[in-house]
Amino acid sequence: MEKQIYSYEESFKESLHYFKGDELAARVWVNKYAVKDSFGNIYEKSPEDMHWRIANEVARVESKYPNALTAKELYDLLDHFKYIVPQGSPMTGIGNDYQVASLSNCFVIGVDGAADSYGAIIKIDEEQVQLMKRRGGVGHDLSHIRPKGSPVKNSALTSTGLVPFMERYSNSTREVAQDGRRGALMLSVSIKHPDSEAFIDAKMTEGKVTGANVSVKLDDAFMQAAVDEKPYVQQYPIDSAQPTFTKEIDASTLWKKIVHNAWKSAEPGVLFWDTIIRESVPDCYADLGYRTVSTNPCGEIPLCPYDSCRLLAINLYSYVVNPFKPDAYFDFDLFQKHVALAQRIMDDIIDLELEKIERIMTKIDEDPENEEVKHAERALWEKIYKKSGQGRRTGVGITAEGDMLAALGLRYGTEEATEFSEKVHKTVALGAYRSSVEMAKERGAFEIYNSEREQNNPFIQRLAAADPKLYEDMKKYGRRNIACLTIAPTGTTSLMTQTTSGIEPVFLPVYKRRRKVNPNDTNVHVDFVDETGDAFEEYIVFHHKFVTWMEANGYDPARRYTQEEIDELVAKSPYYKATSNDVDWLMKVKMQGRIQKWVDHSISVTINLPNDVDEDLVNRLYVEAWKSGCKGCTVYRDGSRSGVLISTKSDKDKKEGLPPCKPPTVVEVRPRILEADVVRFQNNKEKWVAFVGLLDGHPYEIFTGLQDDDEGILLPKSVTCGRIIKNVDEDGTKRYDFQFENKRGYKTTIEGLSEKFNKEYWNYAKLISGVLRYRMPIEQVIKLVGSLQLNSESINTWKNGVERALKKYIQDGTEAKGKKCPNCGNETLVYQEGCLICTTCGASRCG
């Protein structure tokens, strides 16, 4: 039977009704989760269709096992995102026959042991790209790469160290994250590695390693040495009893650099590696291939090479009975029942994932390329298939912790709230592990289970002390899953549940949005007129559960409130002093540590700080996180990475008016030699390259064209910068040459850039370079290029390429004036790393 196709408008309208008027939730669902084919046809009208799709597929798996859940029972758990919410890839992919993609949210790849050859490095690069094209986020560790200056037995003679390969992997991520594909990357390194300082500094250079998150793995010895201001020995190989290279450093100096960089740019994140390994249940099987080497991009799942994880969240708010009322309570009986079912559903999803991987491998087999070309991708998925089936790792987590606490009248960050949260997460741990043991009785334990291997693991010992019967049954019957739990960020998931995200507090209970209006329309209230004369109406947006609090306490959400009245309302609510920017940060870190005791994987959480905090606070937070038993920690200081998170609250003391202005410095005579960046990109299926000449770090000229036209430019992919040299031929003709250094330091010159590119492209490039020379703001240059009325299709493609190349140089946080977010309709787009990001809804678009 032919499936019905819905228009975007039909699906959005029905979803808007489903979400009770929440436009953002409706648009995000249609854009991200509704089933679509490769032509963009939509086959689901609302989340109701999606939930039946998921329920029917999980029920099909259930039917293979005893005590099977029915599709209706499963649907009731999923309906309206009330209780159990598969996250991301499972929500999109389960029952979706239009995609050949994995159901896993994240993967770790790499080598377990010494493998620092160029071949191993290239192999990881290819595997990273192959996973990203199937929707996967990827993490891998660089500690196996030789430090800079080490002797190597090839033509280079010495190793380049970590940083060039960071850039390589980052560029691969940015390359694959085009044309609708996804790319998310985590790079990690041990602090014990002699190049770890260079790794920590790599992202401090603007425009470098922009396609990866970076985290440094800190051992207890380093942390203690940093606190005590004592020396610390780095070595390579990092785990060798007989290292080939050692270096003694001052631990506190390197620690201060980590703190400074995190304060300034939110990276690196820190991973407390000894805690991770000590607490890791899978590492009881390290010698069988389950040695943890890195984490996924968000940090909530430490993994061994070629393992993966699927995520699911339990909506904590839904277990609060009589929310925001004096008699509110948490229904632990229903919660325990649903935790067991969530673990069961996650195990079913592993079976569905194995089917998906089989389909991926079948597609690879059927692809027309020869076996040599396909071998690496096929071998990659074979390894992932084996690990997924052998360990059956799951990622059961939660969302709406902040709303749950508020609904119970508890203020996030207080001792009372933390104590209750710890009780909830202890319940999750015991319930999920009990469910895994029960499934081992019915379905069989994961194949390498061995109770003796796990008997000294601190997490297992904690479970045994809390529930001796569970531990005895586990030893007797085994366990279905090697590890079960995590707490992931639930960004778009929380839009669907209309709650706070993960274990985070509410960002803001009340904020303002602007909507453009026609001042001549009836019932329109003009609050703001911009510099172009457009009129806007400002309206208050309440956090969904803040509205529930208002209704429970006799306040009308539909009424128009003054700012003073809103401030009074917030002060009366349980959200007062409990937002992400004003919770007690040290208490939040301690809360994370206490919850971590009951999570076998890790917790992804960010400590949001105001812009004016000093570096010492970041230092204290990181040290407290280590001492509290956290497995990792990330801080974000407001404005430190402009444009990612921007508070809607304006500075009341800021005076209106134009800022002081001085004319830009104009260099009339071009220096003979300019530093230059090489920017590669793809338009449709054509590969393009741009050479951007820089003066004082600002674009001064640009040469752009096809990389693989008839003339061709023989430029290694590793080349990202060089110099543009202006020369004069014997006949007086001026020409521009590009010179770069290879990895051995030898210079290569490509002569006559003007002859390498299409003449028409060259003439337009001269025009744009003239504008750049006189320091027109980059965003205005892009606007100018975009407005050019050009006739031929090829020159319009070139025009798009120039825009993409120049976007890299827009300062992060620059407003994209006059542009509307396609997701939420607000004019709140800013540039971040060359992409447009909406500060209202978080939607992003690159290219």
What are these regions (language model features)?
Residues 834-844:
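Cysteine-rich micro-motifs
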Residues 471-473, 647-694:
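Short, Gly/Pro- and small/polar-rich lid/capping loops
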Residues 218, 284-286, 296, 302, ...:
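Terminal amphipathic helices with adjacent charged low-complexity linkers/tails
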Residues 2-68, 154-168, 178-290, 321-326, ...:
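Conserved, charged catalytic cores of large soluble enzymes
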Residues 75, 235-238, 338-385, 389, ...:
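Internal maturation/activation junctions in enzymes
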Residues 57-63, 77-154, 162-165, 176-179, ...:
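Function-dense linear segments that define catalytic or interfacial modules
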Residues 822-826, 840:
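Short, cysteine/histidine-rich loop/knuckle motifs that typically chelate Zn2+
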Residues 23, 299-301, 353-354, 358, ...:
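Catalytic alpha/beta core of large soluble enzyme barrels
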